């Protein structure tokens, strides 16, 4: 009564097998894919579980070590900036290629010469005690000309080296003092011209000041002259009238009779 009327089996976990799924003809038509039964050319023959495998261990330092190294470098840079620590500058050594080039310039084999025997641009300061400048070289240095100080130093020492005869001064060295005197005379001429110009400017300023003082000084007071109005006929009449008004009437009559 409780059993199924249909034939066959509904299927359970004990009756399921992945091999049957792989070999099924209609597998590609089923919805969904599974790693246990890959389908198609993109899944067959490929490692589908590559992401789950362990990776190779990193050979580099760990994150904590990197952070500690960065903090230490920052601390050293801060101390150097504040002046609590002296920065050590590592000298850059010569490479093999540079050494071979220097030997080629000198014109010898690199095996015959050592690095200590080669004198470069910085050798003048180190061998200043051994190289004595001549009087001509000193004069040239005063004028600002370049002085050749690269002398070859023998390994035996300066005492055993034969003293070379002193060279005679060349014509170029003789010309240098003349050029110096010519420059001095030019400078003196320029100074004289400047002094003359200054003197002229001073004179012009003095003349201008005198002219300004003359123009600004008040003019001398002119003698008082009689006004123009005093000579006019109206003023004459007024004066006569005032004089007549001051006289007695009897006098006025006498004057009029005398005028008649």
UniProtKB/Swiss-Prot annotation:
Q: Which InterPro entries match?
A: MMTA2_N, MMTAG2-like
Compositional bias annotation for Gly residues: 1-11
The keyword DNA repair is assigned to this record: no
Composition bias (Basic residues) maps to 183-206
Q: Kindly indicate whether the keyword Phosphoprotein belongs to this entry.
A: yes
Cross-link annotation Glycyl lysine isopeptide (Lys-Gly) (interchain with G-Cter in SUMO2), location? 22, 104, 113
Keywords in alphabetical order, please: Isopeptide bond, Phosphoprotein, Ubl conjugation
- Give the span(s) annotated as Disordered: 1-21, 106-133, 146-260
Q: Where is the composition biased (Low complexity)?
A: 117-132
Comp. bias regions, Basic and acidic residues: 106-116, 170-182
What are the Phosphoserine sites (modified residues) in this protein? Answer: 123, 127, 215-216, 219
Q: What PANTHER family is this protein classified in? A: MULTIPLE MYELOMA TUMOR-ASSOCIATED PROTEIN 2 (PTHR14580:SF0), MULTIPLE MYELOMA TUMOR-ASSOCIATED PROTEIN 2 FAMILY MEMBER (PTHR14580)
Stated name of the protein: Multiple myeloma tumor-associated protein 2 homolog
Question: To which species is this protein native?
Answer: Mus musculus (Mouse)
Q: What is the lineage of its organism?
A: Eukaryota, Metazoa, Chordata, Craniata, Vertebrata
């Amino acid at each position: 009564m409780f059993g199924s009327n249909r034939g066959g089996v509904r299927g359970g976990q004990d009756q399921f097998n992945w091999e049957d799924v792989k070999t099924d003809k209609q597998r590609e038509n089923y919805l969904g894919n599974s790693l246990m039964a890959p389908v198609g050319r993109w899944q067959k023959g490929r490692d589908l579980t590559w992401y789950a495998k362990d990776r190779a261990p990193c050979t580099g330092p760990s994150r904590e070590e990197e952070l500690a190294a960065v903090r230490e470098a920052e601390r050293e840079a801060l101390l150097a900036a504040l002046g609590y620590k002296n920065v050590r500058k590592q000298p850059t050594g010569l490479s093999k290629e540079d050494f071979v080039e220097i030997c080629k310039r000198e014109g010898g084999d690199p095996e015959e010469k050592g690095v200590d025997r080669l004198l470069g641009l910085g050798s003048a300061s180190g061998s200043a005690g051994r190289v004595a400048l001549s009087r001509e070289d000193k004069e040239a240095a005063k004028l600002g000309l370049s002085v050749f100080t690269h002398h070859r130093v023998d390994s035996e020492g300066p005492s055993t080296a034969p003293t070379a005869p002193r060279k005679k001064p060349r014509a170029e060295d003789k010309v240098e003092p003349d050029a110096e005197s010519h420059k001095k005379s030019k400078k003196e001429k320029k100074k004289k011209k400047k002094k003359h110009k200054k003197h002229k400017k001073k004179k012009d300023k003095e003349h201008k000041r005198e002219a300004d003082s003359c123009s600004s000084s008040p003019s001398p007071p002119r003698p008082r002259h009689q006004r123009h109005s005093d000579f006019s006929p109206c003023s004459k009449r007024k004066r006569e009238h005032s004089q007549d008004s001051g006289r007695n009437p009897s006098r006025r009559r006498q004057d009029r009779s005398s005028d008649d």
